[in-house]
Amino acid sequence: MEEFKGYLQKGGFKQQHFLYPLLFQEYIYGLAHDQGLNVNASTFNEPPEISGYGNKYSSLLVKRLIIRIYQQNSFLYSVNNSKQNRFVGHNKNYYYKMICEGFSIVVEIPFSLRLVSSIKETKEIMKFQNLRSIHSLFPFLEDKFSHLNSVSDIVIPYPIHLEILLQILQCWIQDVPTLHLLRLIFYDYHNRSNSITPNKSSYGFSKDNPRLYRFLYNSYVVECESIFYFLRKSSSYLRSTSFRPLLERTHFYGKMKHIGVTCCNDFQKTLWLFKDPFMHYVRYQGKCIIASKGTHLLMKKWKSYFVNLWQCHFHFWSQPSRIHINQFPHFSFYFLGYLSSVPINLSSAKSQMLENAFLIDTFTPKFETMISIIPMIGSLAKAKFCNLSGNPISKPAWAELSDSDIIDRFGRIYRNLSHYYSGSSKKQSLYRIKYILRLSCARTLARKHKSTVRAFLQRLGSEFFEEFFMEEEKVLSLILPRTYYPLHQLSREPIWYLDIIRINDLVNHFDL
């Protein structure tokens, strides 16, 4: 990043927001590939003197490539001409991918510089490093959701129109050539994809260029949430929490009180104006959760607000029927691998007044998180640890490894799952996962030694797996003093860790 800043200041590009010249810097593509590129100039049909020393990557090759991108229909040659032009075929996909990877590095520079400058301006953000953890969100839900009435689980609509994305980026990137090149890349890939598969989405390049896709998606989400931030900042009722520390909250936007919401379309027509006395907004992956203590009518207004926001501001048609308003405690929702709900717990207390005794029933809502075992078994079956019925099977791909490596892999998977699901209110499903992985490990070892599982376990003993499948509460009992928590109580209470910054692949059941 310091090298980026030095180049921008040296060339005078920082003040004018010129990013286009960075596309011709070799270190940009070295960063994109995390190594030096060895691109042969003959693949470009260029003479050796253009490629530079040692046939290494040259900025002149990128310049020639960008010129070809600007040429009309440069990627849409017929099959008959593909033999005469080496730019067509498998090479064109490589060229396109190379430009996109370098381009994704370049367009992130304004955002990265702004984040670095904001961190230097204040040290307040350093106090919230623990909020990087995914588990840091669950204590907030435990504290707040038990007092709320309504919740709505919304899928953020995507993709939006390409021109809307470009309009969003114009607020951040003021370099016209860079935006023009991005537009050409969008439509060029769109045309090439539709010429092969007409029904393919225009954002099919998410698999080919995940970094550029994530950048575009995050830009769109930031635009959505910046509207909430603007309303929150402009409201006279909101004077409590600053927005700057919330930059560190990867999956948490913040609490909003008494928000006066106004949404205007192109005709400056006010759609809604209302105040919510207690509203919470949480975003995770491709979804967001809106929870409120208000009435059902107020939630319907929020629903209409989101629909009008997507239709008027982003020109994206969103069906109102896809946004469901649910009432606690009769609703459970999937959240970061957990099945979350707010059931009503009944507790009775005996009260005695003089000679009369009374039983007082107290209904207390409590936020609970459980492991959804059916999707979890589906993930384990997809990874070839069991079948769809949950019966453990061997892992033939690991049968060539040593015994210690096989056991270490299975044990590491279970420890990671146990670590992630430590916040579950009920541990029975976690024991089921442990059973599947232990027996799958035994079947894999028995397959390797051409023996049965019973004979293998009798020869080594069941204690052979204990050190590799150590329980989470046993680990905590070694760390915490004995007087800090009783072991039986520790196994029942949810435990949230502040070192989990990504979702386990087996936990992420759904393609969002």
Swiss-Prot record:
The processes (GO biological process) annotated in the record are: mRNA processing; RNA splicing; tRNA processing
A molecular function (GO) term? RNA binding
Q: Name one Pfam family in it.
A: Intron_maturas2
Keywords of the record, alphabetical order, are:
Chloroplast, mRNA processing, Plastid, RNA-binding, tRNA processing
Q: Does Protein transport count among this protein's keywords?
A: no
Family (UniProt)? Belongs to the intron maturase 2 family. MatK subfamily.
Recorded hits in HAMAP family, A to Z, give: MatK (MF_01390)
Q: What is this protein called?
A: Maturase K
- In which organism is this protein found? Lemna gibba (Swollen duckweed)
Could you tell me the gene encoding this protein? matK
